């Protein structure tokens, strides 16, 4: 074998070895993938197994509960039948009692009616009712008379109130008149005071004149006519009369308030 042939054989062998290694790697990779799939399948299987066991447990519990419900339903049906029977018996007893009570009531009413008819209690009752009605009518008439008297009293009070109101108005008018007079007197008083002051000043001036002087005598008379004390007495009298009228008005207002 020549060297070139040997060299080609070596290259071909290496190429086969490389191809074998590549195939080996692919096989290993495929084995790993298969193992991973097997692992996932086993995990899924375990999960589904657990779920199945849980569902089986739930089904068993529900089946047990269903059995209990059926048992309870049967017991309720028996109890319902018993209650229905008792109800029917009670209804029959009630109807019988009702008939008996009705008969006793009719019998009692008949006995009462016969007794009343025998001793005339019904007529006595009617007579008592008539007497009560008469008494009530008499009471109502008395109340009506009392109301009439009260109305007359109120009318009298109303007339008295009107009279007091009229007197009040008259007193108010009289008070207004007196107040106007008082104002006039106050004006005259003020004028007299001014005149008095003027005359006093003139008096000082004429003190040196003879007492028999005609002008001096005239001034003295005029001074006495306009003395302040006299005007003050008139003012005080009017003021007293006004206060009396105001007091009278206040008393009448108080009396009207009490009447209302």
Swiss-Prot record:
Keyword annotations of the record = Cell projection, Coiled coil, Cytoplasm
Q: Which residues cross the membrane?
A: none
Q: Which InterPro entries match?
A: CCDC172
Q: Which cysteines are joined by disulfide bonds?
A: none
Cellular component GO terms, alphabetically? cytoplasm; sperm midpiece
| Coiled-coil segments | 13-194
Subcellular location(s) per record: Cytoplasm; Cell projection, Cilium
* Quaternary structure and interacting proteins, as annotated: May interact with TEKT2.
The record's comment on protein family reads: Belongs to the CCDC172 family.
Q: What is this protein called?
A: Coiled-coil domain-containing protein 172
Organism lineage reads as: Eukaryota, Metazoa, Chordata, Craniata, Vertebrata
